[in-house]
Amino acid sequence: MGEFYHELTLSPSSYLELFSDFLLEATGEGIEEEGNSIIVRSDQDLSWLIEALQEFCQTLSARVSEEVNFSHSLTWKRNEDWIERYRQSIQPIECAPFYVRPSWHPPKPDLIDLLIDPALAFGSGHHGTTNGCLACLGALELEGKRVLDVGCGSGILAIASAKKGAIVEMCDTDELAVGEALKNASLNQVIASKVWIGSVGDAEGEYDLIIANILAAILIMLSPWLKERLKPGARLILSGILGPYKEDVLRKFGGFTLEKELLCEEWVTLQLRKN
């Protein structure tokens, strides 16, 4: 980054995590969450984002049937090592029995260490959907189980499963995500038995557990393959579901028993068992 940079501070009225996801995907820049605000910094002019955010608000408002808006400020600042400030803003997260941390923080005794350095658009454990999935994984016996992480992103959920003794596979339709997941697996000294660019439709055989932390619409679209690839009695962890869409997702899994439902921020995580 040069001597000066552009900084956008955004304060949504609600759905902070959705705005964060949108900004990550739209800009490819690292973001910082500070209270109820999101900060984006870039060498490039960010003024174009305002119109894009207004369109995003309209779409989101229609989907959730409530008014969503935001306030913002856009400034041009002298570079004062914001990267170091960003690093300091990323704090470890304890989601027992897991401890998610960046490399510049030490591990915590007696917890399963998940070493994830935040990347541009891949989960580092700070998202409500990731927390929900980790909470489910933490309570399951996974030793020797065959586990698939669909839409793996950073690979954090596959890595967590492997550290509990599972034989893991992971996939993502984004080639960059697969590369990031492999890097994080290596960082954690974890080996995935199979990794591919694609989705559950490309999987082979049956699994004891499938984790899919994506979005409700995609979970619905993938439901035939998710059901097909699970052994009888196997479990399915689904997340990325906003509350209003929970029933739509559950209807696609009528032959499953709902074992657990968690709400973290605006996000629902479901743990199901195949009958």
Curated annotation (Swiss-Prot):
Per the UniProt entry, the Enzyme Commission number(s) are: 2.1.1.-
One GO CC term on file = cytoplasm
Compartments, as annotated in UniProt: Cytoplasm
Question: Which protein family is named in the record?
Answer: Belongs to the methyltransferase superfamily. PrmA family.
Chief location: cytoplasm
Q: Which reaction does it catalyse?
A: L-lysyl-[protein] + 3 S-adenosyl-L-methionine = N(6),N(6),N(6)-trimethyl-L-lysyl-[protein] + 3 S-adenosyl-L-homocysteine + 3 H(+)
Spell out the coiled coil positions from the record. Answer: none
Record-linked CDD domains = AdoMet_MTases
Disulfide bond is among the record's keywords: no
- Binding sites annotated in the UniProt record for S-adenosyl-L-methionine: 130, 151, 172, 213
**What gene makes this protein?**
prmA
Q: Name one GO molecular function term.
A: protein-lysine N-methyltransferase activity
Q: What protein name does the entry list?
A: Ribosomal protein L11 methyltransferase
> What does the UniProt keyword field contain?
Cytoplasm, Methyltransferase, S-adenosyl-L-methionine, Transferase
**HAMAP family assigned to the protein according to its UniProt record, in alphabetical order:** Methyltr_PrmA (MF_00735)
Q: What does this protein do?
A: Methylates ribosomal protein L11.
**What is one process in the GO biological process aspect for this record?**
methylation
Entries under Pfam families matching the protein: PrmA (PF06325)
